[in-house]
From Swiss-Prot:
<dbReference type="Pfam" id="PF01225">
    <property type="entry name" value="Mur_ligase"/>
</dbReference>
<keyword id="KW-0573">Peptidoglycan synthesis</keyword>
<dbReference type="InterPro" id="IPR005758">
    <property type="entry name" value="UDP-N-AcMur_Ala_ligase_MurC"/>
</dbReference>
<dbReference type="InterPro" id="IPR000713">
    <property type="entry name" value="Mur_ligase_N"/>
</dbReference>
<keyword id="KW-0547">Nucleotide-binding</keyword>
<dbReference type="GO" id="GO:0005737">
    <property type="term" value="C:cytoplasm"/>
</dbReference>
<dbReference type="GO" id="GO:0005524">
    <property type="term" value="F:ATP binding"/>
</dbReference>
<keyword id="KW-0132">Cell division</keyword>
<keyword id="KW-0131">Cell cycle</keyword>
<keyword id="KW-0067">ATP-binding</keyword>
<keyword id="KW-0436">Ligase</keyword>
<keyword id="KW-0963">Cytoplasm</keyword>
<dbReference type="InterPro" id="IPR050061">
    <property type="entry name" value="MurCDEF_pg_biosynth"/>
</dbReference>
<comment type="pathway">
    <text>Cell wall biogenesis; peptidoglycan biosynthesis.</text>
</comment>
<protein>
    <recommendedName>
        <fullName>UDP-N-acetylmuramate--L-alanine ligase</fullName>
        <ecNumber>6.3.2.8</ecNumber>
    </recommendedName>
</protein>
<dbReference type="Pfam" id="PF08245">
    <property type="entry name" value="Mur_ligase_M"/>
</dbReference>
<dbReference type="GO" id="GO:0071555">
    <property type="term" value="P:cell wall organization"/>
</dbReference>
Length: 476
C-alpha cells in the first residue's frame, strides 16, 4: 500500500471503540501509522486495540489531542465534543471516518458493500470467497468476522473489501470498483429527509462505480429493482430468487446448520453456468441472497467453483449474526440461546424466519427496541414483525442517547403486538426477570433468540446460566 506517508504524525480517533472506527484504526496501525484514540468506556474492542499496541484513553478530554496531527471522528461525534473543539481551536485537521476510509480505498481496488440490511454478513462472505480463491484482501467490516477474531485485516493483495455505511450519506465518498446493494429500506430519514432522497443516494453510489467495474443489485427487493432504470451507463448484475436474476438460487434445501443450494448464473451471452451443491452454514433465505452477491464478486475474479464451495463451507459467520451463545440442558434435549444484532423490523422478520426454518419446537423472541425514535417511526412495522415467534418478550427500550418519547416504550409494543393478533407477548424489565419467566416454560428443542443493537447481547450472554441456575434451585 502506497499513499499518505506514515510520517504524517499521530492520528487520533475519537470514539475508537466503535466498530467502524476500530477497523480503520487497526489497518492504519498495521500499515505503520502512529494511531491512538479515546472512547467513553472500556470494552471488548478497546481491549483488542490495546493488545495490538494501540494507545486508548478512556474519556473525551481536550488534552487527549494535544500531540495529534489529525483527528478522525465518526458520525456519532458532534461539535461540542471537547476533543473536536480542541482540535478545531488548534487548527488540527478533523476528518470524518468515511473520509479516512476513502483515503485507504483510493490506494487499492475495492469491493464496497452497501444496503440497509445485510452489509456486514455480505462483506464477510465476499472476504471469505476471495480468501478461498487465493486473493488476500484487506477487509474493513462493521462486525467481528469470527474467522479473523476482528472486524479488520490487512491483506497483501491490491484489493480491499469494505462495508459502506449509508446512515449519514458518507458512503458516497466510497467509490468501489465493484459495488453491492443488498436492499433499500426507509432508514436514516433524520439525515436524508425523505425516502426518495435515500434512493437517490443509492443511485449515486452505484453510478460512482467506474466504467470497468460492476454493481451487483438484489432484484428481489422492490425498491432496488425500481432504481435499475435510473442507472443506464454502468454494468449491472442482478441476483436473487427471481427468475429474472442474472445470478439465481435454486434447489434450496434447509438442512441442519444452514442451507444447501445451487447457483445458476446467466452470462451476457446467454450461456448458463451452474454451481451445484453449495452448503452455506447459516440459516435463512436472506443469507442465501447475501451469498449470491458474494458469488457474483468471486466470478469477477474467476474463482473456481470448488473454491467457492469451500469458502462457504468454511465460513465462520459474524459475531452477533445468529450467534449461538448458550445452551440449556433439559432432559435428553436442550434449548439454544441465539444472539442477533437485528433491530429493524425487516431484519427481525428475516432472523425469525431463519429461526423458524431451523427450530424443531418453539421460537421464543426477546427483543430490545433500539432508540425511541426508531420504535416511534416504525411502530406499526414492529407490531407485525414477530409472526414467526411463538412467544415475544420485550425489554426496555435502549435509548442510545435519546430522550424518551411519551407513549413509546416496551409496553406500547406489547400492546400493539397483541392488537395485531400475536397470542403471546409480555414485557420484562431486567435479565433476571426474563430468566425467571423463561425458566418455567421452556421445553427441549426450543430456540431463544435475543434481538437488538444495544446491550441485549449482555442479557443473551448470561441467559443460559441464569435459567439453568433457577431451574436447579426450583427442581424444574
Amino acid at each position: 500500500m502506497k499513499g499518505v506517508g506514515t510520517d504524517i504524525g499521530r492520528i487520533h480517533f475519537v470514539g475508537i471503540g466503535g466498530i467502524g472506527m476500530s477497523g480503520i484504526a487497526e489497518v492504519m496501525h498495521n500499515l505503520g501509522y502512529q494511531v491512538q484514540g479515546s472512547d467513553i468506556s472500556e470494552g471488548y474492542t478497546v481491549d483488542a486495540l490495546r493488545q495490538m499496541g494501540i494507545k486508548v484513553l478512556i474519556g473525551h478530554h481536550a488534552e487527549n489531542v494535544k500531540d495529534a496531527a489529525v483527528v478522525v471522528v465518526s458520525s456519532a461525534i458532534h461539535r461540542g465534543n471537547p476533543e473536536v473543539e480542541a482540535a478545531l481551536e488548534n487548527r488540527i485537521p478533523v476528518v470524518r471516518r468515511a473520509e479516512m476510509l476513502a483515503e485507504l480505498m483510493r490506494l487499492k481496488s475495492t469491493v464496497a458493500v452497501a444496503g440497509t440490511h445485510g452489509k456486514t454478513t455480505t462483506t464477510s462472505m465476499v472476504a471469505a470467497l476471495l480468501d478461498a480463491g487465493g486473493i488476500d484482501p484487506t477487509v474493513i467490516n462493521g462486525g467481528i468476522i469470527n474467522s479473523y477474531g476482528s472486524n479488520a485485516r490487512l491483506g497483501d493483495s491490491d484489493w480491499m473489501v469494505v462495508e459502506a455505511d449509508e446512515s449519514d450519506g458518507s458512503f458516497l465518498r466510497l467509490d468501489g470498483t465493484l459495488a453491492i446493494v443488498t436492499n433499500i429500506d426507509p432508514e436514516h430519514l433524520d439525515h436524508y429527509g425523505s425516502f426518495e432522497k435515500v434512493q437517490d443516494a443509492f443511485v449515486e453510489f452505484v453510478s460512482n462505480v467506474p466504467f470497468y467495474g460492476a454493481a451487483f443489485l438484489c432484484i428481489d427487493h422492490p425498491v432496488v429493482q425500481s432504481i435499475l432504470p435510473r442507472i443506464r451507463d454502468r454494468r449491472l448484475i442482478t441476483y436473487g430468487f427471481s427468475a429474472q436474476a442474472d445470478i439465481r438460487a435454486v434447489d434450496i434445501t434447509p438442512i441442519s446448520g444452514g442451507n444447501r443450494f445451487t447457483a445458476v448464473i446467466r452470462g451476457r451471452d446467454g450461456d448458463i453456468r451452474r454451481i451445484e451443491n453449495i452448503f452455506l452454514p447459516m440459516p435463512g433465505r436472506h443469507n442465501i441472497q447475501n451469498a449470491l452477491s458474494a458469488i457474483g464478486v468471486a466470478l469477477e475474479f474467476s474463482i473456481p467453483d470448488a473454491a467457492i464451495r469451500d469458502g462457504f463451507a468454511r465460513f465462520g459467520g459474524v459475531k452477533r449474526r445468529f450467534s449461538r451463545v448458550g445452551e440449556i440442558k433439559i432432559g435428553d434435549g436442550s434449548v439454544l440461546v441465539i444472539d442477533d444484532y437485528g433491530h429493524h423490523p425487516v431484519e427481525i422478520k428475516a432472523v425469525l424466519s431463519a429461526a423458524r426454518e431451523s427450530a424443531q419446537q418453539r421460537v421464543i423472541a426477546v427483543v430490545q427496541p433500539h432508540r425511541f425514535s426508531r420504535l416511534h417511526d416504525l411502530m406499526t412495522e414492529f407490531q407485525s414483525a414477530f409472526n414467526d415467534a411463538d412467544m415475544v418478550f420485550v425489554a426496555p427500550v435502549y435509548a442510545a442517547g435519546e430522550q424518551p418519547i411519551a407513549g413509546v416504550d416496551s409496553q406500547a409494543l406489547v400492546s400493539g403486538l397483541k392488537q395485531h393478533g400475536h397470542r403471546s407477548a409480555q414485557a420484562v424489565d431486567s435479565p433476571r426477570s426474563l430468566a425467571i419467566a423463561l425458566a418455567d416454560i421452556i421445553k427441549a428443542d426450543d430456540i431463544i433468540i435475543c434481538l437488538g443493537a444495544g446491550d441485549i447481547t449482555k442479557w443473551a450472554a448470561g441467559l443460559a446460566a441464569d435459567i439453568t441456575s433457577i431451574r436447579e434451585v426450583h427442581h424444574l
